[in-house]
Curated annotation (Swiss-Prot):
It is found in: Cytoplasm. It is an enzyme of class 1 (oxidoreductase). This is UDP-N-acetylenolpyruvoylglucosamine reductase. The active site is at R174, S224, E294. InterPro entries: FAD-bd_PCMH, FAD-bd_PCMH-like_sf, FAD-bd_PCMH_sub1, FAD-bd_PCMH_sub2, MurB, MurB_C, MurB_C_sf, Oxid_FAD_bind_N. NCBIfam families: murB, PRK13905.1. GO terms for molecular function: FAD binding; UDP-N-acetylmuramate dehydrogenase activity. It comes from the Bacteria. The keyword Cell membrane does not apply. GO terms for cellular component: cytosol. It catalyses: UDP-N-acetyl-alpha-D-muramate + NADP(+) = UDP-N-acetyl-3-O-(1-carboxyvinyl)-alpha-D-glucosamine + NADPH + H(+). Keywords: Cell cycle, Cell division, Cell shape, Cell wall biogenesis/degradation, Cytoplasm, FAD, Flavoprotein, NADP, Oxidoreductase, Peptidoglycan synthesis. It comes from Halalkalibacterium halodurans (strain ATCC BAA-125 / DSM 18197 / FERM 7344 / JCM 9153 / C-125).
Amino acid sequence: MEQLVESLRALQVGEVRVNESLAHHTTWKIGGPADVFVIPNDIEGLKNTMKLIQETGCKWRVIGRGSNILVSDKGLRGVTIKLDKGLDHLEVNGESITVGAGFPVVKLATVISRQGLAGLEFAAGIPGSVGGAVFMNAGAHGSDISQILTKAHVLFPDGTLRWLTNEEMAFSYRTSLLQKNDGICVEAIFSLTRGDKEDIKKKLQKNKDYRRDTQPWNHPTCGSVFRNPLPEYAGQLIEKAGLKGYQIGGAQISTMHANFIVNTGDAKAADVLALIHHVKDTIQKQYQMNMETEVELIGER
């Protein structure tokens, strides 16, 4: 691993850190150390990082802003790559925008609204990055990424870069092709529509206000923990089961919205995991329903 670190630094791929606490890089503020942590300077830096990883055969993982993931207390082995400011470019071409994977979704929705472009209002309050949003087909308020994505620029582990169409991305509810294949979305093209700036601004603010009033943004959280077992809603089921406010260690089911687990200050991944299992067991016993997690559980157990 030391040789890999030296090689990464010699190639000047970006920031390279050793034993970096992932609690600093997740919205839950939870997670053990990454053996090697890389923040690429650009797409070329990411390509060179992946080339070295393939040559050494070590494990790897890509993260964005760290939402929608639960990193174990033991952390991640191998190389963790964070797509951040090196991949946060934005180009507007009429009603089409090309945006880097590291661009924050909330910021994008705000910036685009000021230019009179509609279609991203649903993303107000989504805590992740563009890359993560594409990866999981993030959505809210009746829309999702699949409704606006034209193409995704994907880097595969063998170093090839390909533009994948919306159809090739195989989107479904909170799912995309990238969850089944080892591709990394490095940028995306979204197709938006021209609209009235004031109308777009009002809709965006309405969605932001809804999230602020109904979801617990005063504590670290990852976003929604469970997928909605349609036509039911996960939060409503958990609340009906009497689990609002239930706490294990430093992890608590939010008293505002039961599909959120908050870090009250000193939560460990083990606390959150125990709480997730308790919810699943309770819902299974009371309603004979299997609750699937929307949050991804990663790292050494």
